[in-house]
Amino acid sequence: MAALTGVRFRTESTPATDSTSDLNMVGNLANNTSVTSVVVDDGTDFTAGQNIKMNSEEMHISSISSNTLTVVRAVNGTSVGTHNDNVSIFEDTSPTYSPSRNPDMNVDFNTDYKGITVTQAYGGKIYTNERYGKQLAWELRYTNLISADRDILEALWNAVKGRKTSFYFSPDSGTTFYNVRFKEEELTFTQTAYNIYSTTIGLIQEVS
């Protein structure tokens, strides 16, 4: 399980929205993880912290300077590749659904095998049945959320209709994403000061 270093939420498994900006480099973007500067048509089409995809390679944007993106190559289980000039760049929805601040550091996360049931027959023999395997879970506690961040979490809650639809959560700044659902049936905020809120969010991994 990835340690919590930076939380991102998105509604799609991979960047799928056409950014309308293409790669704008002489030659190509080399097949090398040490090549981390990506020049695009318009840097304002992107946000630091979000993930992008060129061909089948997913990248994480660390920072933006004008039309140059500084990225981490080959994240979320993808492989580094060569990308020709003018290739389309796709972006994820994480800027829409990720608060500007991370949760407090007292984050609970666990691994369980609750999908395995155990029964014991007469005579003492034990039988097991695996309905599903390992499942990860997180509990994120936010304090000092500004109104805009509260609205972002409410937008995510409404986009997936509470517990109805799964979405994607990264605990490590977009390097790894997990398919998850909300654990609770309602999203509750407590106003602790003027325009300041707190909430706790439980997430459980979607397993097959």
Where are these regions (language model features)?
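Extracellular/virion structural assembly segments
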Residues: 1-20, 76, 82, 88-208
